[in-house]
Design a protein with these regions (language model features):
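Conserved short alpha-helical segments that host acidic/polar catalytic motifs at enzyme active sites
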Residues: 92-139
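Extended accessory regions or peripheral subdomains of proteins
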Residues: 1-45, 50-89, 126, 130-186
């Protein structure tokens, strides 16, 4: 345990994002009951189920909510909302470059965590192809939804159906707060 804490603190000192994890017994919760509790008053949340062999329930169920970052493309404009203490908003007329920037800031070393940790979750709609290929999209947007939305969830809950446990994880990004030990203990 002390080794994990030491690596966490060293990573933050090097300005590298880290993952905090808490393991719980899954004997009284299901992915659906957990999602219903977590997603209250949440605009962005998800439940992903792994599947094996096309129809058999897989090992993992992943839940996420309360995004740190929301990336959205609408009408040729990419926007990124950062939900930190200082709430920032960034707009770009270059959606693909904006996506590359988002991928770059969402990279970090998972260390010895053996459960899946989704970094970017969402969708890239078909209209996104126009930013990558010279193509004429003749269909008009009649339902007025974003061309793409991706989130970086603040809280990720992973049900391991083999080990019968729950891992609750959160990404911790380097900040001005230098009390790294206190951040870990919270």
């Amino acid at each position: 345990m002390l080794e994990i804490k030491k690596k966490f603190i060293e990573g933050l000192k090097k300005k590298e994002p880290q993952i905090l994890i808490k393991n719980l017994n899954a004997d009284v919760e299901t992915p659906i009951s957990c999602l219903l509790k977590l997603k209250k008053n949440q605009k962005y949340s998800f439940l992903l189920e792994s599947v094996e062999g096309g129809s058999q329930r897989g090992r993992y169920s992943l839940l996420g909510c309360d995004p740190d970052i929301v990336w959205k493309v609408s009408k040729n404009i990419a926007s990124i909302k950062y939900y930190d203490k200082n709430y920032k908003y960034k707009v770009s007329e270059e959606p693909i470059q904006s996506l590359k920037d988002l991928i770059e800031i969402s990279k970090f070393d998972k260390g010895n965590i053996d459960t899946p940790y989704p970094i970017l979750v969402g969708y890239l709609g078909y209209p996104m192809i126009k930013y990558m290929e010279k193509i004429n999209l003749e269909n008009k947007d009649t339902i007025n939804i974003p061309e793409s939305i991706l989130i970086i969830p603040k809280i990720v809950t992973v049900f391991d159906n083999i080990k019968d446990n729950i891992s609750v994880m959160t990404a911790v990004y380097p900040s001005e707060d230098k009390n790294f030990e206190n951040i870990y203990d919270q």
